[in-house]
């Protein structure tokens, strides 16, 4: 986690996701979800100003259906409303690298997936993963960045994009 301080100092935005990423636990109830977020905030507290973190991404996305198995059909709708009530903004992706799938794609396939999903999009929010099992993502990253620049995209934080401070393609 100390790396998070360096990431924030470099101007990157820190957002909340999950302390455990265990759907069966975090989506068992809304209380379980928010406890997981509190645990994450406590872990980050020594490294960044957690009071300034007001963005999150729901594991599986805000429209995931796997959560229904654990917390019922309405849990995501309730969590989204609660997030807004708590002062959080939440974001989903529209471009998926598919880098965390069981097939473990190589860097070339990750880039093909991104190009496929980005085609026709004015604004792209790309889902990438940084686990040990997804080492190919790091290898694909320079080519991803080059691709988006060649296509005329600009890079910005989610907060900048939300505030329309970052021009779309």
Where are these predicted regions, by residue range?
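Short, well-structured secondary-structure segments
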Residues: 6-8, 13-17, 91
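Catalytic domains of cell-wall/extracellular-matrix polysaccharide-remodeling enzymes
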Residues: 2, 21-127, 131-149, 153-154, ...
